[in-house]
Design a protein with these regions (language model features):
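A short His-aromatic
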Residues: 105-106
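Conserved N-terminal segment of class I S-adenosyl-L-methionine
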Residues: 1-98, 109-121, 135, 139-151, ...
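Hydrophobic adenine-recognition pocket in adenosine-nucleotide-binding enzymes
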Residues: 102
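Conserved beta-strand signature within the Rossmann-like core of class I S-adenosyl-L-methionine
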Residues: 122-132
Length: 256
């Protein structure tokens, strides 16, 4: 995991809070109220604090030892430092488990076992992970959404895509949530919630792996700029080569 510092968390604090306050009510409208939530890679706990605003009585977060306890937005006793690259040192069951833009920082060898951890923790998982080419500090395993869905589905969980369509066109929400945010639900969760089961039935499994236009356009502009610089450098190099060749000929006595 990268060593994120206080400045990193300060920079993302309010954008994360806004996203959480927009998305959490959507999640709860679908799955119903939750008493307990666990966040794997919780950072300073902003998402957990928003779940508490919406009635969660018990929240717990895990992240690396780099997290400054002074920045936590949950009680320090609700946070545990852990190496997320290893099987999680926790047990117990919660109403909801979540991990948002975290698993891309873990080695590919950890991909299967992190899903094992998540399904052991809750019947419903809120999940977001970087796709190939997304880029970011410390990303070592970017995979498509349907690859992660297959992992959950092998463990009996179904894939739900109810949130992305609701936030897709909202420019105030960070594009990585617009692009990557999915829910996974166990048979027990679906059996007790007809609305949840209906969303699972309606989810278009073939359209999970997508790239948001905001990042596509940004990457395209960047590549155009790089290509322009390349063209200019090639032109300058050709001009320098021509000057060098001319100078070499002028100093070559055999040319006189």
């Amino acid at each position: 995991m990268p060593n994120y510092d206080k400045q990193f968390y300060d920079d993302i604090r309010e954008t994360s809070r806004h996203a959480a306050r927009t998305i959490v009510p959507m999640v709860l409208e679908l799955i119903g109220p939750v008493a307990s939530v666990i966040d794997i890679g919780c950072g300073n706990g902003i998402w957990l604090s928003v779940f508490r605003e919406h009635g969660a009585e018990r929240t717990f977060g895990l992240d690396g030892g780099h997290v400054d306890r002074a920045t936590l937005e949950i009680a320090e006793g609700d946070f545990k430092a852990a190496d997320l690259g290893q099987p999680l040192p926790i047990a117990g069951r919660h109403d909801l488990a979540m991990t948002l833009e975290v698993v891309e920082h873990l080695p590919k060898a950890r991909a299967e076992s992190i899903v094992d951890d998540l399904v052991s923790l809750a019947p419903i998982v809120l999940f977001s992970a970087a796709v190939p080419g997304q880029g970011g500090e410390g990303h070592v395993n970017e995979e498509w959404q349907d690859t992660w869905a297959e992992r959950f589905e092998r463990r009996g969980y179904r894939t739900l895509d109810p949130i992305r369509p609701k936030i897709w066109h909202d420019p105030s929400i960070s594009w990585w949530y617009q692009q990557n945010l999915l829910l996974f639900a166990s048979p027990e969760a679906l059996a007790g919630n007809p609305d949840l089961a209906r969303v699972a039935d309606q989810t278009d499994r073939a359209r999970l792996s997508v790239v948001h236009p905001r990042i596509f356009v940004a990457r395209h502009k960047f590549l155009v700029q790089i290509n322009r610089k390349r063209i200019n450098l090639v032109k300058e190099l050709a001009e320098l080569q021509a000057k060098y060749d001319a100078l070499s000929r002028s100093n070559d006595p055999t040319e006189n």
